[in-house]
């Protein structure tokens, strides 16, 4: 007997993506640029206990995400030398996008299995709430970089 075939969303499938790049300024003097990214949620496989015993591969969808990055540049000329100063801000609005999710909820901060955990189930020195609210399931926080570049 042949198995029933079906189309299954791949782990990286994403229905909607939007990338917008905006730059203004005077090239060689100053520029400011922003990159906006939006993406609908990617699939994950739900826990069959939550989906009434029916398990569909990649049947759940993670939350949407968005991000804004900023770059500002200013160039100075000194006796034939060019000095470029810049500011980079990754995740400008410090958004906590949920990239990893629990299969029981589809969220990064709620695990319905947490009610059944005991302290001996948790590896390390974390409490159960600390274990559930795992920072590695979120996007990186805001990061600010200042820099200098030299040219001849």
Feature locations, PLM:
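C-terminal extracellular loops and terminal segments
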Residues: 1-64
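Short structured motifs
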Residues: 5, 55-56, 71, 131-133
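Residues that define the transmembrane beta-barrel architecture of outer-membrane proteins
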Residues: 14-18, 64-68, 81, 140-144
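Membrane-embedded beta-strands of outer-membrane beta-barrel proteins
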Residues: 20, 70-72, 146-148
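Preference for bulky hydrophobic residues occupying beta-strand positions
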Residues: 24, 34-36, 70, 87, ...
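C-terminal beta-signal and adjacent terminal beta-strands/loops
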Residues: 29, 38-49, 75-152
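Active-site-flanking ligand-binding surface segments in enzyme catalytic domains
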Residues: 56-82
């Amino acid at each position: 007997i042949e198995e029933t075939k079906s189309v299954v969303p791949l782990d990286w499938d994403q229905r909607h993506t939007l990338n917008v790049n905006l730059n203004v300024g005077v090239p060689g003097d100053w520029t400011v640029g922003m990159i906006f990214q939006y993406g609908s949620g990617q699939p994950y496989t739900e826990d069959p206990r939550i989906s009434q015993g029916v398990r569909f591969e990649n049947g759940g969808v993670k939350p949407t995400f968005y991000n804004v990055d900023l770059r500002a540049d200013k160039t100075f000329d000194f006796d034939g030398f060019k000095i470029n100063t810049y500011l980079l801000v990754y995740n400008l609005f410090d958004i906590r996008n949920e990239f990893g999710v629990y299969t029981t909820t589809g969220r990064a901060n709620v695990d319905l299995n947490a009610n059944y955990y005991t302290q001996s189930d948790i590896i390390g020195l974390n409490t159960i709430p600390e274990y559930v609210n795992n920072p590695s399931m979120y996007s990186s926080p805001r990061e600010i970089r200042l820099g200098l570049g030299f040219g001849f």
